[in-house]
Amino acid sequence: HQINVFRTYVGGGFGGKSDPFPHEMCAAILARKAGRPVRITFDREEVYWINRGRHPSRIEMNLHADSEGRISGIETDALIDGGAFASFGHVTTYYNGVLHTAPYEIGAFHYTGARVWTNKPASGAMRGHGAVNSRCAVETGLDDLAEQLSVDPITLRLANLLPPHSATITGFRVTSIGMRECLERVKEASGWNDKFRKMPLGKGIGIGCGFFISGSGLPIHWDPNKFPHATVHLKIDMDGGVTIHTGAADIGQGSDTVVAQSVAEVLGLPLDMIRVRSQETDTSPVDLGSYS
């Protein structure tokens, strides 16, 4: 190996560190040529040039429901603006579809999506990419449906929530789900019945639902080869302790601590005999990334 990358504790995810950026490569190449450390800094305007923003989206959606508001199907066509470089465009297009329907129980779902190249800064994995825009489309669509059916928007959502221990139509497993209790408490605490459609011109009250998925134990590449998302190597030390080599980057989620605790529990060792090395690529096995 000619290059050994040392990872520092920079903190924070939110998609901003998911892409490899040209200036990172430039800094490494310049450092090798100069034999000195190289640092690249940007002013705020330059940050917008080189970083990644959210994908502007045009989403067309048809909701199918009976007279009582039970949703039988959703048809969605999404077109997203990925800018001039690929970045996470294909992944965001995929997420727009698979994250589209939760937390609702949908009878049928059809999705088409496309990412277009434009002469603009690239869009990427910015804060829940692929979920935020589609959630906006679904929630505003539900409001329109409630208006057409003369149904209360909260009542409509309560009628279509997924039950616990079920699955979304796109294949995500649902264990516990507190959305019903949450909506009922919000309705009561907000004074919904006294405010909805009863506030003066220019003021109003609305509702929208969101959700998140936990990817722990789920490889990002869903393929038949079943490759692991992460691997660790354990080395038994002379003092009886264990050194863990992992490529998982601790960006605040506590992976260094959790890995150490897991190994300590399985091997029956005290935590102070566990050492974690996750800072350099020479000694760390492959890990597909830590991101929010």
Indicate residue ranges for each PLM-predicted region.
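Structural alpha/beta core scaffold segments of enzyme domains
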Residues: 1-292
